Structure formats: C-alpha cells, structure tokens
C-alpha cells in the first residue's frame, strides 16, 4: 500500500511541477520563433558572419547554419551566392562540429535576447 502511495505521489509531482515547466519553456520558445518569423521570414540571416536560420519542432526551437558540402566549414555571409554548394546543419547535429559551437551559441543569443 505504501508503494502505491509513492507511485501516486510521483505522478502528481510529474504532472503538477515538471510538465507545466516544460510547457512554459515551449511557449516562450514559440513566441520568440513567431516574432522572428514575422520580422525575417524563412530566410537565412547573417549573424556573426555566418548564415543562420531557425526551425520550430515539437521539442522547441532549433538553430540551423549553413556549411560547405565539401569542406564542412561554416559558410560565411558572402557564400549565399553559391547556395547549391551549401547544406544546412542543425545545432543539434553540431556535436560533430565542436569547433563551431560558438555559432549555435550566438544564434540562440540573437533569438532570445
């Protein structure tokens, strides 16, 4: 009986504390993303000499940046002219590109501050 009580308390904790915090986080991210899209649309923006874009997923906002297909180096703002040689990388995939972590940091800073 005591174990059943602990299980019930656990679910009450999850649904009353944790779930509302996650929902609030997603609401704030969606508001920031909506404001960004109203101002800039779906275009890549030059932030810190890198081309950045954002997408909204069920898990929140993801920053995307462009890299060269061949060299895997981040594209600079002037590379937008050669769009066929570029691929988009999300900051979630950026673990492969540890040296480029500051690009993602700057992108999220621009969106939320």
Swiss-Prot record:
Membrane topology: Single-pass type III membrane protein
Post-translational modification comment from the UniProt entry: Contains two intramolecular disulfide bonds. They are created by the viral disulfide bond formation pathway, a poxvirus-specific pathway that operates on the cytoplasmic side of the MV membranes.
Reported function: Envelope protein part of the entry-fusion complex responsible for the virus membrane fusion with host cell membrane during virus entry.
Upper taxonomic lineage: Viruses, Varidnaviria, Bamfordvirae, Nucleocytoviricota, Pokkesviricetes
The UniProt record lists the keyword Disulfide bond: yes
Self-association state and partner proteins as the record states: Envelope protein part of a stable entry-fusion complex (EFC) which is at least composed of proteins A16, A21, A28, G3, G9, H2, J5, and L5. Formation of the viral membrane is necessary for the assembly of the complex.
Family per record: Belongs to the chordopoxvirinae A21 family.
Coiled-coil boundaries: none
Assigned GO CC terms: membrane; viral envelope; virion membrane
Stretches that traverse the bilayer: 1-23
Localization (cell): Virion membrane
Ranges facing Virion surface side: 24-113
Protein name: Virion membrane protein A21 homolog
Top-level lineage group: Viruses
Single GO BP term: membrane fusion involved in viral entry into host cell
Keywords: Disulfide bond, Fusion of virus membrane with host membrane, Membrane, Signal-anchor, Transmembrane, Transmembrane helix, Viral envelope protein, Viral penetration into host cytoplasm, Virion, Virus entry into host cell
Organism from which the protein derives: Fowlpox virus (strain NVSL) (FPV)
């Amino acid at each position: 009986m005591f174990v059943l009580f602990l299980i019930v308390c656990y679910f009450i904790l999850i649904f009353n504390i944790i779930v509302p915090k996650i929902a609030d986080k997603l609401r704030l991210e969606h508001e920031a993303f909506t404001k960004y899209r109203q101002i800039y649309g779906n275009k890549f923006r030059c932030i810190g000499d890198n081309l950045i874009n954002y997408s909204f997923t069920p898990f929140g906002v993801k920053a995307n940046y462009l890299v060269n297909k061949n060299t895997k180096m981040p594209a600079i703002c002037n590379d937008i002219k050669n769009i066929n040689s570029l691929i988009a990388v999300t900051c979630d995939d950026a673990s492969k590109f540890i040296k480029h972590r500051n690009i993602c940091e700057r992108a999220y800073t621009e969106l939320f501050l």
